[in-house]
Amino acid sequence: MSTNTEIIKNSDLQSLINDKRRLINEIKDFNKSIKPLEFESYQDYFLIKTFKKGISASGHVDIDSLRNKEYGIYYKKIKRNSTQEVGEPIPRNTSSSSSSTRSNSSADISDTEYSGENTPTTTGAASRRRRTRSRAIQRENSLPASLPSISEANANNDDVTISEINGSELPFPIPISEVENIDIASDITERDGIRRRSSRISERDKRRSQSRLGSEEDEEGDGHDGDEGETKIQDLYESLVPKILESRRRSDWILPPKARYTPEKQMRTKPSFKSIKINELVGNKRIRSILSRFEGGVAGIRKRDWDSTQ
């Protein structure tokens, strides 16, 4: 019985050893069958490693060939639009005609209104264009009837009169006789233009964040309606070099010297210039005789070893 049990144990051990060897061989064969995702060639690998910013549609950029008179640099400056919207302050003109315009307009302010383009305000802020009577009437006629003018508002409110309006509270001083001809809409547009740039930017950011939140909520609602287990994978905008399953090893590719990348190296050579010492030059008699003809020619030069150099 003991011999039978020993034979069974040995057979079990041998079968385990054989299974282990078989699994090892299968793993080795499986590893050999795996083909990694690699680049197509060494040239594509070279393009990625030496990638530079430039103007290109496919991502393969040769910036040296792009440098010409049209594309000297790879970026363009973003300039603000020169056209100004209604209600924005008009920039100050620092020409010499500002003083003359101010003096002439102050004399004839009752008859003809002046334009505030060339007249700086006392507070130092950029002046805004004054409305004439014809402009105010045209603007009031073009607006809908839902926006009442100051004269209609004062007619409804008996407590407030035109004489009680303080001219210092307005954005620019206006005579009392001209207050009736300015409508509320023009004042609103001017006050919108006077607002700080930081407040306008913050309001714009708030509107953008609210729109983004609304779009995200819509996307989440659409996603819950579909299959919950399915995940949406978004591809990248552009693949620089596509990867393929059966690719050639990039280490087997060698570019010709003409296509290899050689970075620009700065020469580490220090230029050497020929120098002549003034004492050795003046030591010559002929040079000394020429310099002695001029005022202060040999003054301040050491007279040592003058006779040694002839």
Swiss-Prot record:
Residues 83-155, 192-230 are annotated as: Disordered. GO terms for molecular function: protein-macromolecule adaptor activity. GO terms for biological process: mitotic cell cycle; negative regulation of transcription by RNA polymerase II; positive regulation of DNA-templated DNA replication initiation; regulation of DNA-templated DNA replication initiation; regulation of sporulation; regulation of transcription by RNA polymerase II. Residues 192-208 have a biased composition (Basic and acidic residues). Residues 107-120, 139-155 have a biased composition (Polar residues). The keyword Ion transport does not apply. It is found in: Nucleus. GO terms for cellular component: histone deacetylase complex. Residues 92-106 have a biased composition (Low complexity). Residues 127-136 have a biased composition (Basic residues). The modification Phosphoserine is found at residue 215. Keywords: Nucleus, Phosphoprotein. The keyword RNA-binding does not apply. Present with 861 molecules/cell in log phase SD medium. Tethering factor required for histone deacetylase HST1-mediated repression. Probably involved in targeting HST1 to a subset of SUM1-regulated genes. Interacts directly with HST1 and SUM1. Required for the interaction between HST1 and SUM1. This is Repression factor of MSEs protein 1. It comes from Saccharomyces cerevisiae (strain ATCC 204508 / S288c) (Baker's yeast).
